[in-house]
């Protein structure tokens, strides 16, 4: 009994020495203290017992490794997938867990040669197991992707609800409850209103168990690489089926504009599907496979989505730094608005540290698109300035530059809110009463009006010059009044330009018809009846000649606006008809000359009205 107690006491002493001795020197010191305290704790007795115990421990370790080695060798050599049989997969994972536990337990004693040799063997076995589990992981990823299903869902609200943050948190908590998890597939998508199944929940659970072992064994990078390569290939296929080509910036710039317009439409669809459906689904899939390992999930997600994201961003960047020809404005606006609307998705989907570069690049390219839009307006200004004053427009009609600029600005103002945002983000300072977009539009209008003033000088006839300005001025006012451009420029601008048009009207009248009116004025100081009759007869003769000439010429001129044309005719009739009627009435009452007045009077009052009504019947093509 005493001997048994002494053995226990020695065992306790050995255990204390082994536990407290962090290295061989410290253990020797502890043994020396015990030996000095009691002769029974001699260093020889304690050392002998410890040696026997350690030898037994190494043997136990070797036996455990032999057993595990046999199991791992069997699984590694298996021709069939281990995860084809749930019992095999469970046994394989248990074996790995045993090996991990042994390595962790014995690693603190790795400096002891026999144990170090065993641990080296254990590491080799672990590497074999990891190679096999990596193969199984890849195979399961590929098989799962092949078994996807695509199911349209009619309720858009339900789809949006699936993507909100609360739903994601609930899904994370319920990772192991067996519920199906919706993830993206490489199918042609024409609507965001979809529920997509790619990997069954059982497959996700299996992948998670594998990932947990690989990460726990220090093979996290290998696991992330396999996962990322499989999902990246799948995601790129999804983007391809959405119609998105892999184009370099140079290829985009060389593409004919009509083809590029179609490519932009495809890009917009692909960007929306990617940011609203595919990327969020990949994010959730990563979180489930790497549940409990947030860094691995973040890194894997970034590796999966980086290529497709860069493809999307590079295309948008190519548009931003490409040609700034004015006709490209509307498609550039489409790309800008798409990027703007997707900014919340960029912020939420790429919120982790690994994706910050992608997130920041998206913001940079979005701002660059805004710069491109402002640059396009500068190019429009240059186009107006450079438009030459060469051949005159026949009949003083609409100039093509007027029609182009006004229709362009009207179309642009349909995106008024976007343009206001673009110009507010520039370095300009708005005035107290107007936005920077208003300032920009006012400046373009001023350039256009100045350009038209120069072009009007091409006409040698001053009256035709004013008809040209009147036509183009009226067209400008009408286009401003009828759309959002009027909201930008304001009622005061419209009133001022209506006054301008009326001034052109008056100038036209003065430059041509006021001379006619002068011929119908009679100087009462003329000497005698015969002198007055002779004067009136000469004036009537000149009136007939000039009236014929003016009507002949002005009937070929153009006034495109029917209301303006009627206003002009009424104004001329009011000016001319009463004066002419008074003149011929007086002429007819001049005694003998008056009796023969019909010989000199070519037109009656009604004839004058009819001839005035025939004015401005030149072609009105190009009015749109």
Curated annotation (Swiss-Prot):
GO terms for molecular function: phosphatidylinositol-4,5-bisphosphate binding. Disruption phenotype: Twisted leaves with small spontaneous lesions, early yellowing of leaves and anthocyanin accumulation defects. Chlorotic shoots. Retarded growth with wrinkled rosette leaves under long-day growth conditions. Impaired abscisic acid (ABA)-mediated and mannitol (drought)-promoted stomatal closure. Increased number of lateral roots. Plants impaired for both B1L and EXO70B1 produce more lateral roots than single mutants. Target of the E3 ubiquitin-protein ligase PUB18 that mediates its ubiquitination and degradation via the 26S proteasome. InterPro entries: Cullin_repeat-like_dom_sf (IPR016159), Exo70 (IPR004140), Exo70_C (IPR046364). Residues 148-176 are annotated as: Disordered. Coiled coil: none annotated. The keyword Ubl conjugation applies. One of its GO terms (biological process) is defense response to fungus. One of its GO terms (cellular component) is phagocytic vesicle. Keywords: Cell membrane, Cytoplasmic vesicle, Membrane, Transport, Ubl conjugation. It is found in: Cytoplasmic vesicle, Phagosome; Endomembrane system; Cell membrane; Vesicle. The keyword Membrane applies. Component of an exocyst subcomplex specifically involved in autophagy-related, Golgi-independent membrane traffic to the vacuole. Regulates autophagosome formation and autophagy-related Golgi-independent import into the vacuole. Positive regulator of both abscisic acid (ABA)-promoted and mannitol (drought)-promoted stomatal closure. Involved in the regulation of lateral root formation. PANTHER family: EXOCYST COMPLEX COMPONENT EXO70B1, EXOCYST COMPLEX PROTEIN EXO70. Belongs to the EXO70 family. Interacts with EXO70B2, SEC5A and EXO84B. Binds to PUB18. Binds directly to B1L at the plasma membrane and in small vesicles. This is Exocyst complex component EXO70B1. It comes from Arabidopsis thaliana (Mouse-ear cress).
């Amino acid at each position: 009994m005493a001997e048994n107690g002494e053995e226990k006491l020695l065992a306790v002493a050995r255990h204390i020495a082994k536990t407290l001795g962090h290295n061989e020197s410290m253990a020797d010191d502890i043994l020396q203290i015990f030996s000095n305290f009691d002769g029974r704790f001699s260093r020889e007795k304690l050392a002998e017992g410890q040696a026997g115990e350690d030898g037994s421990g190494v043997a136990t370790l070797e036996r455990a490794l032999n057993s595990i080695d046999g199991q791992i060798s069997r699984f590694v050599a298996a021709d069939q997938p281990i995860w084809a049989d749930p019992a095999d997969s469970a046994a394989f994972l248990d074996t790995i867990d045993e090996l991990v536990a042994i390595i962790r337990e014995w690693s603190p004693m790795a400096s002891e040669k026999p144990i170090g040799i065993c641990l080296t063997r254990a590491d080799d076995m672990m590497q074999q197991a990891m190679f096999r589990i990596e193969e199984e992981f890849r195979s399961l990823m590929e098989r799962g992707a092949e078994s996807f299903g695509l199911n349209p869902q009619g309720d858009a609200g339900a789809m949006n609800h699936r993507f909100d943050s609360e739903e994601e948190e609930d899904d994370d908590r319920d990772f192991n409850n067996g519920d199906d998890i919706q993830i993206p597939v490489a199918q042609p998508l024409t609507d965001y209103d979809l529920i997509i199944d790619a990997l069954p929940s059982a497959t996700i659970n299996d992948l998670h168990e594998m990932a947990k072992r690989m990460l726990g064994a220090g093979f996290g990078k290998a696991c992330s690489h396999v996962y990322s390569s499989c999902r990246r290939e799948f995601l790129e296929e999804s983007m391809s089926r959405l119609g998105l080509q892999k184009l370099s910036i140079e290829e985009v710039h060389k593409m004919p504009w009509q083809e590029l317009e179609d490519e932009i439409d495809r890009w917009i669809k692909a960007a929306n599907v990617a940011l609203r459906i595919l990327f969020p689904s990949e994010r959730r899939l990563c979180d489930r496979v790497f549940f409990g390992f947030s860094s691995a999930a973040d890194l894997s997600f970034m590796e999966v989505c980086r290529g497709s994201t860069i493809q999307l961003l590079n295309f948008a960047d190519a548009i931003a730094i490409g040609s700034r020809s004015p006709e490209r404005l509307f498609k550039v606006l489409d790309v800008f608005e798409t990027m703007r609307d997707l900014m919340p998705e960029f912020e939420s989907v790429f919120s982790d540290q690994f994706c910050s570069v992608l997130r920041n690049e998206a913001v940079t390219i979005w701002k660059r698109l805004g710069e491109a839009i402002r640059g396009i307006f500068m190019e429009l200004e240059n186009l107006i300035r450079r438009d030459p004053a060469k051949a005159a427009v026949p009949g003083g009609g609409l100039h093509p530059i007027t029609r182009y600029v006004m229709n362009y600005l009207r179309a642009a103002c349909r995106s008024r809110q976007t343009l206001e945002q673009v110009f507010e983000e520039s370095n300009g300072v708005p005035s107290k009463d107007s936005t920077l977009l208003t300032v920009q539009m006012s400046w373009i209008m001023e350039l256009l009006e100045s350009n038209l003033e120069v072009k009007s000088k091409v006409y040698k006839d001053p009256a035709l010059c004013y008809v040209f300005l009147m036509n183009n001025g009226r067209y400008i006012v009408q286009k401003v009044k009828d759309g959002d451009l009027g909201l930008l420029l304001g009622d005061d601008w419209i009133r001022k330009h209506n006054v301008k048009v009326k001034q052109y009207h008056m100038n036209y009248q003065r430059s041509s018809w006021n001379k006619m009116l002068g011929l119908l004025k009679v100087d009462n100081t003329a000497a005698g009846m015969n002198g007055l009759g002779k004067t009136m007869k000469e004036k009537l003769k000149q009136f007939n000649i000039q009236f014929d000439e003016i009507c002949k010429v002005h009937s070929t001129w153009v006034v495109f606006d029917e209301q303006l044309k009627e206003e002009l005719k009424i104004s001329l009739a009011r000016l001319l008809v009463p004066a002419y009627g008074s003149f011929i009435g007086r002429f007819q009452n001049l005694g003998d000359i008056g009796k023969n007045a019909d010989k000199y009077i070519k037109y009656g009052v009604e004839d004058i009205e009819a001839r005035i009504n025939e004015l401005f019947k030149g072609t009105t093509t190009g009015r749109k």
